[in-house]
């Protein structure tokens, strides 16, 4: 992820900093930015870098990101000028290695963004994302807007490994040439020169000096996501069954199996809801029909489709769900 040098009073009164963040598509970059904006109570605009093109070509003009922020601020210019703009998929506008035609969606977009990042007055339409003679325009100064750029940066790991392996193989105390080949946290060692090699132009990186990476979610993290947040999905289902005076529990092994299934889908925490809904559908339909049921326990066997949930009748011991229905 790349962060920009923007001056917000809530960021320790430090000079403004644009930020550059990198991480897998399932590492939670967008959710992190949304949470930041909500905690700071500032407007947020999210856009995809792949939709941006140089002015005059098909696609969204670069200034459209400021228009989206103005809309998020309910057309309040002062509010928008203290907001956050998150540009995702920034790796997709890397400079093309070999091209003879004008790169209107790559290097040209990076060049066009320089004006926004360095802080300038931008004329943007009110209530629209594209300029039109019939739409009134206002001036938004981008100097205090926090720009955050993020992307997955495929193949960046190989660039970092090549640099580190080359450095470690030089000198009397040289290490093995493949020392970093199995380093799982290789992205944490990223430097600006790696991003330049990837295809980000020096002028663009110069305005995004803060670079950090996000690790992919692990099974343990996914289990915590299911259990710990105030609006965790498990708590939502527990609350729904509480309305029928039924207690819902999940065995730790069951949660681990759900996390494993989510890891297999390779979409991060997004997969958790669909997986849990698959197993809870019948339970949410059948349990309210029987007023004698006091609790339901989701087991690993049920998640692995080797058994059924365990239920406890009021005043009785736990029974498999099919026995209870009988």
Q: Where is each model-derived feature located?
A:
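Pre-Walker A adenine-sensing motif
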Residues: 2-15
């Amino acid at each position: 992820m790349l962060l920009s040098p923007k001056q917000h009073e809530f960021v320790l009164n430090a000079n403004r900093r644009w930020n550059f963040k990198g991480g897998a598509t399932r590492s939670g970059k967008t959710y992190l930015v949304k949470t930041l904006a909500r905690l700071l109570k500032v407007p947020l605009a999210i856009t995809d870098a792949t939709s941006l093109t140089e002015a005059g070509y098909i696609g969204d003009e670069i200034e459209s990101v400021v228009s989206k922020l103005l809309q998020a601020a309910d057309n309040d210019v002062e509010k928008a000028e203290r907001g956050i703009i998150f540009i995702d998929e920034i790796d997709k506008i890397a400079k093309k290695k070999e091209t003879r035609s004008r790169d209107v969606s790559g290097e040209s977009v990076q060049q066009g963004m320089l004006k926004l990042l360095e802080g300038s007055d931008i004329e943007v339409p009110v209530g629209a994302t594209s300029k039109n003679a019939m739409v009134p325009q206002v001036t938004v100064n981008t100097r205090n807007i926090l720009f955050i750029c993020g992307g997955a940066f495929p193949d960046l790991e190989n660039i970092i490994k090549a640099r580190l392996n080359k450095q470690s193989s030089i000198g009397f105390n040289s290490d093995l040439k493949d020392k970093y080949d199995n380093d799982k946290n290789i992205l944490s060692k990223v430097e600006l020169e790696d991003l330049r090699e990837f295809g980000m132009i020096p002028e663009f990186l110069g305005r995004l000096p803060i670079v950090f990476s996000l690790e992919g979610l692990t099974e343990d993290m996914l289990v915590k996501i299911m259990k710990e947040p105030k609006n965790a999905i498990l708590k939502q289902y527990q609350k729904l069954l509480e309305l029928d005076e039924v207690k819902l529990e999940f065995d730790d092994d069951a949660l681990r199996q759900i996390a494993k299934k989510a890891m297999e889908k390779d979409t991060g925490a997004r997969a958790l809801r669909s997986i849990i809904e698959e197993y809870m559908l019948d339970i949410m339909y059948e349990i309210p029909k029987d007023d004698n049921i006091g609790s339901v326990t989701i087991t690993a066997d049920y998640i692995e489709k080797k058994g059924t949930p365990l239920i406890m009748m009021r005043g009785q011991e736990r029974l498999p769900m099919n026995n209870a229905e009988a």
